[in-house]
Amino acid sequence: MGRAISKSGPVRALGAMSGTSLDGVDVAVLETDGRDILGFGETGYRAYSDAEREVLRAALGQWTGDAVAAAARVVEAAHIEVMTDHADVDLIGFHGQTVAHAPRLQGTLQVGDGGVLAEALGRPVVWDFRSDDVSMGGEGAPLAPFFHHACARYIGATEPLCFLNLGGVGNVTYVDPRKARPEDEGALLAFDTGPANAPINDFLQSRLGLAMDEGGRIASGGAVENGALELFLAEPYFARMPPKSLDRNDFPEMIGLVTELSDADATATLTAMCAAAVAQGMEHCPKAPSKVLVTGGGRHNPVLMEMLRVSLDCPVEPVETVGLDGDMLEAQAFAYLAVRVARGLPTSAPSTTGVRACVGGGTVTVPEGWTARKT
């Protein structure tokens, strides 16, 4: 019914990511041995409908209950729908949808059952990537840094650089590609910089019924309210040393800081908050990066990108400038991490999540009738 996963050699894996922006499900095929990127495959996307997005929003911040169960059903159905056309793979990496994240309480919840996907798609599924990290004292996020290290080596980078993901929450990975393995000392530093697209999207949804500030058009017509920006940057999170991570809803007062402003001024100020959080976070890098490669939806916002270029003392470019796909990098990351889990390789380290020791987190669910894995 399918190939077993051997101890070495290439594996064709399908990764899926449903991020904190709640826009939809990204899926991407990657060929890897769990260490190096051997090739990129096809990609797919399935947007959430407005009704589905409201179901997901209702579950945010919840750990149990009917809202969480309803969100899980939405996530599973959407993933199965988009994955069906890309399931000719050896292995699937399924992140699920984060609805609650409280690492200081040793809790993180990504809804969606990998077992449901395994049976529906007839492929082994690696899922629940974050729980082991959190149980060992880690933040459980970000998890893409090990893949970022592989990307840096894939593009032939020779000097330290940063990958900046601007989804609902922003996170940055400092990579030294001269280190052979992502778990090597000094290879990586990673953390969440602060809120990114989520508060902008939430504000525009509540004020104007818009899903996002497409092309930065609304922010471009506004002025930044510096008083609100200063209050935002006084939040204790920004004084914490990395590694550190955020839940999508950890800054509920952000929108309150801009509610008295015009639509354009409020959007410009929220955008500036994202850029300022990144700039402040970048001060933690061991040395100035040679460049910052931006991934995630935020790179499509020219106002935000220009704010970053002004704030950071190095080139700021979308990842497409080095041949990578900024819309699919997170999905590709979970394909890569799935293979690492299947082969017993670590997926996070003290320098990326604050976990006590390198850990390979994830549950592997094999569908009935699948050839036994050989690991």
Swiss-Prot record:
Q: Name one GO biological process term.
A: 1,6-anhydro-N-acetyl-beta-muramic acid catabolic process
**Swiss-Prot/TrEMBL keywords:** ATP-binding, Carbohydrate metabolism, Kinase, Nucleotide-binding, Transferase
Q: Which SUPFAM superfamilies has this protein been placed in?
A: Actin-like ATPase domain (SSF53067)
State the InterPro entries in the record.
Anhydro_N_Ac-Mur_kinase, ATPase_NBD
Q: Does the keyword Transferase apply?
A: yes
Annotated binding of ATP, by residue: G19, T20, S21, L22, D23, G24, V25, D26
Gene3D superfamilies, sorted: 3.30.420.40
Q: Does the keyword Kinase apply?
A: yes
* Pathway it works in: Amino-sugar metabolism; 1,6-anhydro-N-acetylmuramate degradation; Cell wall biogenesis; peptidoglycan recycling
Q: EC class of this enzyme?
A: transferase
What EC number(s) is this enzyme filed under? 2.7.1.170
Q: Name one Pfam family in it.
A: AnmK
Q: Which residues form a coiled coil?
A: none
Molecular-function annotations in GO: ATP binding; kinase activity; phosphotransferase activity, alcohol group as acceptor
UniProt xrefs under HAMAP family:
AnhMurNAc_kinase
Extract the PANTHER family matched here. Answer: ANHYDRO-N-ACETYLMURAMIC ACID KINASE
- Function recorded in the entry: Catalyzes the specific phosphorylation of 1,6-anhydro-N-acetylmuramic acid (anhMurNAc) with the simultaneous cleavage of the 1,6-anhydro ring, generating MurNAc-6-P. Is required for the utilization of anhMurNAc either imported from the medium or derived from its own cell wall murein, and thus plays a role in cell wall recycling.
| Similarity comment: family membership | Belongs to the anhydro-N-acetylmuramic acid kinase family.
Would you tell me the protein name for this molecule? Anhydro-N-acetylmuramic acid kinase
Q: Which organism is it from?
A: Ruegeria sp. (strain TM1040)
